[in-house]
Amino acid sequence: MSSLRLLISDSYDPWFNLAVEECIFRQMSPDQRVLFLWRNADTVVIGRAQNPWKECNTRRMEQDGVKLARRSSGGGAVFHDLGNTCFTFMAGKPGYDKTISTQIILNALASLGIQATASGRNDLVVINGEDERKVSGSAYKETKDRGFHHGTLLLNADLSRLADYLNPDPKKLQAKGITSVRSRVTNLVELLPGIDHEKIRTAIEQAFFAYYDEQVSAEVISPQSLPNLPGFTEQFAKQSSWEWNFGQAPAFSHVVDTRFTWGGIELHFDVLHGAIDRCQIFTDSLNPTPLEALAQRLQGAAYRPDAIDKICQHWIDDFPELQTELQQACHWLVEVLR
């Protein structure tokens, strides 16, 4: 039986691909060496210890239909579209060695005429003109008996969209968690016009086979054609859940404020595990009672716009004589938290 395994995903769903990756990693034989190749449609992928509200413009992502996906490895936030090729190398220990997988990617690029080098924070860089530019970023995960190295290659990504989604709104947010380091990047198409996913995928496959002097047939994975992956349904449910993608954020505080014709309001939130642990409201309104009641209602609520909107609607029902003013406040609060 071959020690190599090659898997290719036909799905562009980040939650599907990350669930497949996690299941294969848990269930692989310790003597196997696995290469998994995949792509995600519009997605921001964050590291295991990151805070999405700090890293991302969550409101813009929701407006544009961009998914958020938290991976199980560390590292920073990245934007994926179909101009990226994603790779994952897995191996049991002591065979797992991220320098080997890095070399395979470098060999694949060299076979296409692209000279890249490993640099700094798990990056691959090229010289573009007089500048050194990043074309690949990676992250890693290790357990007692195995490890994986996964990353992306920028082929023809829409780099203008990085700034749209990887910069948070200018909110008054004091947050713990790992902050992404922004790098100067370039697409491989700038160096090799005509490069596409199929070409780079084939080059990586061939470099993988050449390194280990062995070839295997690819297993193509899709939602309609899953390999035997016990626990996949549960893992996909986790990867796609708000509780994992948002609720795993480290504790943080958030202050929002605005002014209406009837008075100004300022809300202080302490958020823990994606829920409002403490809420304080300050106001110069002549009738602060409804706002004090809102602060009490928000205690313990999930820190997500739909949950807060539902609470606000019940709150408004308690003060029918102030419906217009409280609807204003509700609409503002739900929008500012997106």
From Swiss-Prot:
A single GO BP: protein modification process
UniProt GO MF annotations: ATP binding; lipoate-protein ligase activity; lipoyltransferase activity
GO cellular component labels: cytosol
Annotated positions binding (R)-lipoate: K134
Family: Belongs to the LplA family.
CDD domains, per database record: LplA (cd16443)
Residue sites binding ATP per the record: R71, G76, A77, V78, F79, K134
Role: Catalyzes both the ATP-dependent activation of exogenously supplied lipoate to lipoyl-AMP and the transfer of the activated lipoyl onto the lipoyl domains of lipoate-dependent enzymes.
PROSITE patterns: BPL_LPL_CATALYTIC (PS51733)
Top-level taxon in the UniProt lineage: Bacteria
Protein name: Lipoate-protein ligase A
Subunit structure: Monomer.
Note: In the transfer reaction, the free carboxyl group of lipoic acid is attached via an amide linkage to the epsilon-amino group of a specific lysine residue of lipoyl domains of lipoate-dependent enzymes.
Pathway the protein acts in: Protein modification; protein lipoylation via exogenous pathway; protein N(6)-(lipoyl)lysine from lipoate: step 1/2; Protein modification; protein lipoylation via exogenous pathway; protein N(6)-(lipoyl)lysine from lipoate: step 2/2
Keywords per UniProt: ATP-binding, Cytoplasm, Ligase, Nucleotide-binding
InterPro entries: aa-tRNA-synth_II/BPL/LPL (IPR045864), BPL_LPL_catalytic (IPR004143), Lipoate_ligase_A (IPR023741), Lipoate_protein_ligase_C (IPR019491), LipoylTrfase_LipoateP_Ligase (IPR004562)
Location relative to the cell: Cytoplasm
Pfam families documented for this protein: Lip_prot_lig_C, LplA-B_cat
Catalytic activity: L-lysyl-[lipoyl-carrier protein] + (R)-lipoate + ATP = N(6)-[(R)-lipoyl]-L-lysyl-[lipoyl-carrier protein] + AMP + diphosphate + H(+)
Record EC number: 6.3.1.20
Organism from which the protein derives: Yersinia pseudotuberculosis serotype IB (strain PB1/+)
Domain BPL/LPL catalytic: 29-216
